[in-house]
């Protein structure tokens, strides 16, 4: 009988470490809701002790996600576990994930400890986590380079202490699939109480083997796979969840396991993660790349037309990619837009219908026809604009030519005040940015600029993603319009609002800290 493989998503924890700019709470929540809709069993959404912002993100997601188990990471440190539990206590169901290094190299050079001390610490911290929840995951960091006898000792002790999931990470992407399968098999042979816990794997792609290692581990008996959407993560990335999920589905004949994933949500979730994280998906990426279902060879095209199974082992529809996308026009009503969003699987609570419809009408007047990808882009940007705004683009004008110095005039609403400035620049976009810097005095430094077409032809929307440096921190901004300069201006305004919000959060945290300090003095 087919057994279920638990899908553990770490896009918002391990995956976020690869980003050039931290995600806002709203952005993290949007991804979390998409993962919930896709049906992930467990989502690891942060490392609460690392910063007040991470604590807030975990708490916000824990409060709103109902159908997936929410997990937070904690080192084998008392404070880490206590803070993780505090951030998660509002969740319907939660897990604490604690870890410690087990390889000889890590124990000697990083921890400056011994294996016996590591085991003692693991036992104590697993028991501490069990005081807060019956669902505790324990990870043996760098398990791939840990001798099997040592690993078995740690695993047995952690299970005896109360760990319900034991995670075996290939932390540096070092092992070969046959080696990794051997580690899992070896644990089943050597650990007498292993039947009391789920064996999980967490692989990295340094040698391009993350998915292969995870599947080999599943074949050897692992029943939880950890990874990130699109394989994002530090260095070469994490195991690509969409690849593992579809491999399990397509090769069920060999693996004899299944997942609880809603496969129809894979493509949409992948695209959302790509957009929000500002990490384009390579065209040749398995499952979700733009070329994954494209056939250019004449022989292949002929074969597919005769029978798709000649050259396709799965269909675009199986991951929710509908090749025929219906369009709406400026004569379409609000109900029609909502109906189309419903058909695409979006709940009204996930976007602002009034804002979406206003933006839809403006775009429809320009383009004539609005397609599914247009609606999704407008809804995505609308989500950004639901966050409090201090800066708002009121007006801009640019003048440039092949022999002229680019000049821009910009008017920004800054809170209750409206300010205007003009500036020259190295092209129209730079001129707009120079004018904005004069208005705000933020003097942000542009680190990355990318432009992506959303749609086809001359009326395609241009999405500009930028990363800017301000006071040692990096901030991400997104802008969307049919005009590239306008998209660029909106992206910079989005950055400014993110900077402003970060400053407001810092002020609020300082205010609360001062309030708590005053209360202590009163007592």
Curated annotation (Swiss-Prot):
Residues binding Mn(2+), per UniProt: 14, 202, 204, 238
The protein's enzyme class: transferase
Region Regulatory domain: start-end pairs: 392-523
Record pathway: Amino-acid biosynthesis; L-leucine biosynthesis; L-leucine from 3-methyl-2-oxobutanoate: step 1/4
Signal peptide limits: none
GO terms, molecular function: 2-isopropylmalate synthase activity; acetyl-CoA C-acetyltransferase activity; manganese ion binding
Gene3D superfamilies assigned: 1.10.238.260, 3.30.160.270, Aldolase class I
PROSITE patterns given in the database record: AIPM_HOMOCIT_SYNTH_1, AIPM_HOMOCIT_SYNTH_2, PYR_CT
Catalysed reactions listed for this entry: 3-methyl-2-oxobutanoate + acetyl-CoA + H2O = (2S)-2-isopropylmalate + CoA + H(+)
Gene Ontology annotations for the cellular component aspect, listed alphabetically: cytosol
Keywords of this entry: Amino-acid biosynthesis, Branched-chain amino acid biosynthesis, Cytoplasm, Leucine biosynthesis, Manganese, Metal-binding, Transferase
Pfam families hit by this protein: HCS_D2 (PF22617), HMGL-like (PF00682), LeuA_dimer (PF08502)
A biological process term (GO) from this entry: L-leucine biosynthetic process
Ranges of residues in domain Pyruvate carboxyltransferase: 5-267
Matching InterPro entries: 2-IPM_HCS-like, 2-isopropylmalate_synth_dimer, AIPM/Hcit_synth_CS, Aldolase_TIM, LeuA/HCS_post-cat, LeuA_allosteric_dom_sf, LeuA_bact_synth, PYR_CT
Cofactor: Mn(2+)
Compartments, as annotated in UniProt: Cytoplasm
Cited HAMAP family: LeuA_type1 (MF_01025)
PANTHER family: 2-ISOPROPYLMALATE SYNTHASE 1, CHLOROPLASTIC-RELATED (PTHR10277:SF9), HOMOCITRATE SYNTHASE-RELATED (PTHR10277)
Function, as annotated: Catalyzes the condensation of the acetyl group of acetyl-CoA with 3-methyl-2-oxobutanoate (2-ketoisovalerate) to form 3-carboxy-3-hydroxy-4-methylpentanoate (2-isopropylmalate).
Family that this chain belongs to: Belongs to the alpha-IPM synthase/homocitrate synthase family. LeuA type 1 subfamily.
Record note on quaternary structure: Homodimer.
Name under which the protein is recorded: 2-isopropylmalate synthase
């Amino acid at each position: 009988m087919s057994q279920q493989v638990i899908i553990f998503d770490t896009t918002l924890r391990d995956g976020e470490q690869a980003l050039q700019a931290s995600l806002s709470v709203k952005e993290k929540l949007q991804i979390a809701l998409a993962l919930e809709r896709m049906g992930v069993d467990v989502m690891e959404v942060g490392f609460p002790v690392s910063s007040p912002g991470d604590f807030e993100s975990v708490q916000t997601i824990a409060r709103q996600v109902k159908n997936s188990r929410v997990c937070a990471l904690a080192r084998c440190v008392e404070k880490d576990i206590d803070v993780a539990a505090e951030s998660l206590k509002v969740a319907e169901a939660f897990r604490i994930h604690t870890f410690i290094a087990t390889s000889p190299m890590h124990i000697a050079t990083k921890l400056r400890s011994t294996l016996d001390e590591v085991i003692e610490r693991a036992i104590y911290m697993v028991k501490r986590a069990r005081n807060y929840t019956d669902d505790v995951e324990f990870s043996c960091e760098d398990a791939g380079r840990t001798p099997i006898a040592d690993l078995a000792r740690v695993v047995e002790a952690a299970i005896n202490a109360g760990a319900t999931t034991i995670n075996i990470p290939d932390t540096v992407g070092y092992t070969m699939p046959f080696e990794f399968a051997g580690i899992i098999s070896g644990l089943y042979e050597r650990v007498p109480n292993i039947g009391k816990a789920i064996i999980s794997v967490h692989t990295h792609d340094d040698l391009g083997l993350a998915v292969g290692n995870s599947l080999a581990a599943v074949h050897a008996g692992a029943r939880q796979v950890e990874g990130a959407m699109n394989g994002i993560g530090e260095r070469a990335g994490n195991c690509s969840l969409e690849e593992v999920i579809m491999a399990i589905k397509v090769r069920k004949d060999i693996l004899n396991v299944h997942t609880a994933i809603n496969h129809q949500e894979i493509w949409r979730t992948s695209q959302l993660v790509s957009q929000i994280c500002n990490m384009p998906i390579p065209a040749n990426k398995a499952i979700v790349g733009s070329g994954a279902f494209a056939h250019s060879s004449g022989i292949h095209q002929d074969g597919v037309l005769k029978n798709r199974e000649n050259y396709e082992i799965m269909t675009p529809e199986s991951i929710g990619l509908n090749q025929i996308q219906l369009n709406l026009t400026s004569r379409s009503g609000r109900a029609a837009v909502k109906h189309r969003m419903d058909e695409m699987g979006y709940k009204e609570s996930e976007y602002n219908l009034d804002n979406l419809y206003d933006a839809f009408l403006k775009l429809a007047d320009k383009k004539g026809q609005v397609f599914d990808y247009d609606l999704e882009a407008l809804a995505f940007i609308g989500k950004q604009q639901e966050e409090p705004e201090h800066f708002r683009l009121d007006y801009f004008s640019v003048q440039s030519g092949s022999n002229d110095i680019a000049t821009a005039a910009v008017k920004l609403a800054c809170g209750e005040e409206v300010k205007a400035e003009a500036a020259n620049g190295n092209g129209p976009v730079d001129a707009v940015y120079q004018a904005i810097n004069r208005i705000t005095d933020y003097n942000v430094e542009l680190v990355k600029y990318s432009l992506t077409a959303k749609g086809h032809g001359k009326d395609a929307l241009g999405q500009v993603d930028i990363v800017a440096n301000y006071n040692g921190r990096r901030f991400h901004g997104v802008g969307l319009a049919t005009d590239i300069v306008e998209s660029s201006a909106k992206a910079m305004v989005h950055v400014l609002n993110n900077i402003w919000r970060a400053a407001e959060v810092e002020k609020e945290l300082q205010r609360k800290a001062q309030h708590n300090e005053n209360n202590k003095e009163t007592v």
